[in-house]
C-alpha cells in the first residue's frame, strides 16, 4: 500500500485525531467528512476498533503499510512490551525526530527536509526519512540549508521539545538523548489494539 499523500484534514476528521498536530482540523468540524458527517460516528466492531487504531497510528507517523508492518515485526523481536516497543521505534524515525526538534511544523514537512538532503546525522547527510536514529546520535541541518525559510518559520512557532530530545537553536542541531517513556508518547493511541489486529 502506497503512502497517502493527499489532504490530511479529511483523514484527521475520519479518524478523530489531528494529523498535523495543530488541532485545526477538528475545531470547526469534529466529525467525519461527508454530507452526513455528524451522524456517521457509529459503534464499531472489535475488528473495526483495531483497524481504526492501526490507521490512526499509521497516518500519524505517515508510514505506508509495508513499512508499518515491518516496524511492528521488529518491535516484536525486542525485549519488553510489544506495543510500547512499536511506538518507540516509530518515534525513533529520523523524519519524526526532525519534527520533534521543531525543524518542521509537521511530520510531512520533516520528511521533505530529509528527502531533499537538508538533514545530517552525526555530521553525515542522511536522506532516508525512515532512518532509525539511535540514542546519542546528533541530528543537524546542513550548512547550506541553515537559512531555509521553512526551518526559520517552524522554529519561531515551536515552543516545545520533548524531554528525550535536546536541541540547540543556535547550532541547529539536537541529540536523541534516550528512548521515550510510554507516558511521553501519543496518549490518544491504544497500541494494544494494534497488537491484537496483527495477531488475528
From Swiss-Prot:
One of its GO terms (molecular function) is structural constituent of ribosome. The keyword Ribonucleoprotein applies. Residues 22-41 are annotated as: Disordered. GO terms for cellular component: small ribosomal subunit. PROSITE patterns: RIBOSOMAL_S4 (PS00632), S4 (PS50889). Residues 92-152 form the S4 RNA-binding domain. It comes from the Bacteria. The keyword DNA-binding does not apply. One of its GO terms (biological process) is ribosomal small subunit biogenesis. Part of the 30S ribosomal subunit. Contacts protein S5. The interaction surface between S4 and S5 is involved in control of translational fidelity. Belongs to the universal ribosomal protein uS4 family. This is Small ribosomal subunit protein uS4. It comes from Halalkalibacterium halodurans (strain ATCC BAA-125 / DSM 18197 / FERM 7344 / JCM 9153 / C-125) (Bacillus halodurans). The lineage of its organism: Bacteria, Bacillati, Bacillota, Bacilli, Bacillales. The gene is rpsD.
Amino acid at each position: 500500500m502506497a503512502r497517502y499523500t493527499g489532504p490530511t484534514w479529511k483523514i484527521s476528521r475520519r479518524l478523530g485525531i489531528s494529523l498535523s498536530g495543530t488541532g485545526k482540523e477538528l475545531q470547526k468540524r469534529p466529525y467525519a467528512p461527508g454530507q452526513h458527517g455528524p451522524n456517521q460516528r457509529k459503534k464499531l466492531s472489535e475488528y473495526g476498533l483495531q483497524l481504526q487504531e492501526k490507521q490512526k497510528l499509521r497516518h500519524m507517523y505517515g508510514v505506508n503499510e509495508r513499512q508499518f508492518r515491518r516496524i511492528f515485526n521488529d518491535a516484536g523481536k525486542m525485549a519488553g512490551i510489544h506495543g510500547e516497543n512499536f511506538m518507540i521505534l516509530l518515534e525513533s524515525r529520523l523524519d519524526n525526530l526532525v519534527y520533534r526538534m521543531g525543524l518542521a511544523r509537521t511530520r510531512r514537512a520533516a520528511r521533505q527536509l530529509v528527502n531533499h538532503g537538508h538533514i545530517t546525522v552525526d555530521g553525515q547527510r542522511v536522506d532516508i526519512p525512515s532512518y532509525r536514529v539511535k540514542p546519542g546520535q546528533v541530528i543537524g541541518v546542513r550548512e547550506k540549508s541553515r537559512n531555509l525559510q521553512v526551518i526559520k518559520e517552524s522554529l519561531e512557532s515551536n515552543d516545545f521539545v520533548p524531554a528525550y530530545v535536546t536541541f540547540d537553536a543556535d547550532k541547529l542541531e539536537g541529540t536523541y538523548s534516550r528512548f521515550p517513556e510510554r507516558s511521553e508518547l501519543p496518549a490518544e493511541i491504544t497500541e494494544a489494539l494494534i497488537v491484537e489486529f496483527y495477531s488475528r
